[in-house]
Amino acid sequence: MKRTIVQIIFFIYCIANVYPQYSTIWQLGKTDNSSKEFALAPDGKDRFIISGFGDNKKYFYAGEHTPADFPYIIPGPTAEWAGSSYWAGQCRIQLPILIKLSDVNPLKKYQWNIFIENVEYEDCMFLRVEVNGKNYDSPIKPDTKQLIYSIQPGILKEGYNKIVMQLFNGKSLTFDAICLNGPQETQINKIGDTPIISMKMADYELEQGKTRTQPLLLKTITKKSGTLKIQINQKKIFKQVEEGENIYEIPTGKLKDQSKIKVKISTEGQTVATQEFIRSNQQLRRSIDYVDQFAGSSGSRWMIGPGPWMPFGMVKLMPDNEDAHWKAGYEYNVENIMGFSHIHEWTMTGLLMIPTTGDLKIQPGTEKQPDYGYRSRINKKTETARIGYYSVDLTDYNIQAELTATTRSSLQRYTATNTS
């Protein structure tokens, strides 16, 4: 009898761990197979762009905004009504959501659920949900009605959480409802007017007059323009902040080797953040270090990409990842690479190189099916481009590729990242 009771208790324990009990922390919309409560529904998708949706800096504030502030549909990279076409290329559409949570359990899983009214399907279609920088991908079929994303322990955090949705390889997906499920103790809180998303010391120094300083990087996502009062030790700074997502460099005074500073940030008479930091000597940042080499590389053409080109150089080295068509070159949305071409001119390319391992393949494969050829998936998190330098990890081959170029030649270094 005792053995039976122990077995029953053990069985219940296993069930509770395999099928954890979730409660709804936040929900947007009703699960009624209808999108009528969302913005632009039922057929206003042509106003998606002019309504400001799709901008990765236009945030939806969970717990404050309503379904009427969130679009009923998310377009994929080939949706013409959202800016894509044969001539214009792909569009990069993202729907960012900001959620402020309290009593987050770092040892428990959470769930992001998406209920779907309709799918306008294309091959290899999937929806990505990025949670605080961690990507979760879920494939979509023509009859998919629900997507469940299991968020691992420790990904969601106390305070502000950034969740971004992006549709890949498809026309569109129409929402029925969206919800976050998790432990019962976790609660959603109001965002506030000036959320301080993060504070950290920069990994560089700036010139400040005749001295150098290591700036504090302050990231905010604000509803409206305003003023922050920043106190660093005894010094007070008043900083004007703009609407939307921005990163500000806050000077921290003359740097003397390693030193500790205490930072307190206030707005409208209320303290919103306090933290201590250790300053240390870093390299001086130059003006060219602010250049974003990826700017304009989505929905663009062959002449715009993250390659390390010399001005008026004969060699124009750049990663190529698009299938053959009139504007093919580099597209930021594509997460694999066909190789690195040395020529990018009007209707002309050439001398493509890519390091590989394993069996010999003579076809490149396609954007959607890289395994059909010698293409390699890449790690977008570590892809780096700055003036005169490009680096990417070819994850299918465990090779890091580094590129630079002179006026008439390229220099490439391939490093095996997994010697086994």
PLM-predicted stretches and their roles:
Residues E207-P215, I221-S225, K254-S266, Q275-S420:
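Accessory carbohydrate-recognition regions in carbohydrate-active enzymes
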Residues Y22-L107, F115-Q187, V241-G253:
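Beta-strand-rich ligand-recognition modules
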Residues N181-T211:
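Short, compositionally biased P/S/T/A/G/V-rich stretches that sit at domain boundaries
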Residues M1-Q21:
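Bacterial Sec-dependent N-terminal signal peptides
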Residues K108-Y110, D123-L127, K224-L228, I261:
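Short beta-strand/loop motifs in extracellular/secreted proteins, especially
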Residues C91-P96, L107-N113, D203-L218:
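Contiguous beta-strand segments within globular domains
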Residues K171-S172, E268-T274:
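Short, exposed coil/turn segments at beta-strand boundaries within extracellular/luminal domains
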